[in-house]
Amino acid sequence: MNINDALTSILASKKYRALCPDTVRRILTEEWGRHKSPKQTVEAARTRLHGICGAYVTPESLKAAAAALSAGDVKKALSLHASTKERLAELDTLYDFIFSAETPRRVLDIACGLNPLALYERGIASVWGCDIHQGLGDVITPFAREKDWDFTFALQDVLCAPPAEAGDLALIFKLLPLLEREQAGSAMALLQSLNTPRMAVSFPTRSLGGRGKGMEANYAAWFEGGLPAEFEIEDKKTIGTELIYLIKKNG
């Protein structure tokens, strides 16, 4: 078995067939040679894939979200993805804070999950969202077409190909720690690559399991200490279980 065979095997499985092939190949390439056999390599890759995607997206939740949208229930759809469910009660407060200076016309939503639906509810005219699971796009895109809403979904791994789109604001919710765990230095590199003058960056203050001791302080120290000089922190606030930074590019 070589990497191509392993890639084909993983993408043929029901659990991972909707994943971005670039993500699967990246992880297989990183794991190749670390294990005694190709079988162990594939098992290790599957474990990592579950950690970055499986805990957030299931076929059942996507099916239920699509049904909720068909019934016109956007809030129920948002409740069916782990990240948007966590912030649902604070959604208005969150976006009142993010849009306090101005309401953007075009938003880039990086590793978007189902969050673009919240932007639709806020009346954002144009949204470009990317994620590593095609099922998310398959849920949101038909809804956007029905509503004649300018939404584009890209199946894209930002560690393999940074977004080339331009916008007024980028949302990077709870993503940077995951990127940094995958590749050291990639989190700040992503911010530098984005073609928007302003960004909203968030960090979890608790894990999905509810543990949160020291998380907020640790993430704040890491982010504020490592943010490149070309950025300025405009504001920050803890809302619900997220620490939110509003930053802008200088010059």
UniProtKB/Swiss-Prot annotation:
Binding residues for S-adenosyl-L-methionine: Y56, H81, A82, S83, R87, A111, D131, D157, V158, F173, E182
Enzyme Commission designation: 2.1.1.179
Disulfide feature: none
Pfam family, one: FmrO
Molecular functions per Gene Ontology: rRNA methyltransferase activity
Function: Specifically methylates the N(7) position of guanine 1405 in 16S rRNA. Confers resistance to various aminoglycosides, including kanamycin, tobramycin, amikacin, arbekacin, gentamicin, sisomicin and isepamicin.
Protein name according to UniProt: 16S rRNA (guanine(1405)-N(7))-methyltransferase
Biological classification of the source: Bacteria, Pseudomonadati, Pseudomonadota, Gammaproteobacteria, Enterobacterales
Name of encoding gene: rmtB
